[in-house]
């Protein structure tokens, strides 16, 4: 759903979109469970493997988390295709953690991933705008993103921005937990990328 109503004539589109994003960030910050963030980061830092999963638009968010977390040296697993994600989930163990991203938390395929991971003993971190969803109920920790109340921009648009910020928060928390090891791994990544620049 892109538009819920027609854009009012003369409305400041730039201001409206930015204000919606700012409101979503502010509301999420006020409601955020800081303990859940820290404990989620600890699980990720100690995991054998971290599976980063999401479908549709949520898959691009999962890929962003993958792009961030591999900088720390953590063993991360990511796939764009649902069947590939399901295959990864089938290999999960009790020593693994999965971060599943879903705006609604109600998709059949996303639930199938969560159930397979849970059946294999993996810890589940759920990032969603719907903390009462079937997916959220399967999670060990739920990181809630405040849904935007815009009448024009779909909720998931603003939720995406907040999700990216929450990944940044987790990334920094993980680096702090890893101390020197995390910094060393980050520097290795920076060095190898720098060699490819003119």
Task: Indicate where each model-derived feature is located.
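HTH-adjacent hinge/linker in prokaryotic transcriptional regulators
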Residues: 1-35
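A ubiquitous structural signal for well-ordered alpha-helices
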Residues: 21-24, 28, 40-43, 65, ...
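Short secondary-structure junctions and interdomain/linker hinges
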Residues: 32-35, 51, 193-196
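Glycine-rich phosphate/diphosphate-binding loops that line cofactor/substrate pockets in enzymes
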Residues: 35-47
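Glycine-rich phosphate-binding loops that contact phosphosugars or nucleotide phosphates
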Residues: 45-165, 169-178
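A short, charged, Gly/Pro-tolerant segment at domain boundaries
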Residues: 180-198
């Amino acid at each position: 759903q892109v538009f819920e109503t027609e854009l009012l004539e003369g409305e400041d589109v730039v201001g409206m979109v930015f204000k919606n994003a700012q409101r979503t960030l502010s509301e999420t910050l006020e409601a955020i469970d800081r303990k859940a963030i820290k404990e989620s980061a600890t699980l990720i830092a100690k995991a054998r493997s971290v599976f980063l999963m999401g479908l549709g638009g949520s898959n691009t968010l999962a890929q962003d988390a993958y792009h961030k977390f591999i900088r720390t040296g953590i063993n991360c697993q990511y796939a764009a295709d649902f069947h590939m994600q399901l295959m990864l989930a089938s290999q999960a163990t009790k020593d693994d953690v999965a971060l599943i991203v879903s705006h609604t938390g109600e998709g059949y395929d996303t639930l199938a991933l969560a159930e397979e991971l849970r059946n294999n003993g993996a810890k589940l971190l759920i990032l969603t705008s719907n903390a009462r969803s079937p997916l959220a109920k399967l999670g060990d920790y739920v990181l809630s993103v405040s849904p935007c109340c815009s009448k024009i921009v779909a909720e998931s648009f603003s939720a995406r921005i907040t999700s990216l910020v929450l990944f940044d928060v987790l990334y920094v928390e993980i680096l702090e937990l890893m101390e020197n090891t995390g910094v060393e791994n980050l520097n290795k990544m920076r060095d190898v990328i720098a060699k490819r620049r003119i």
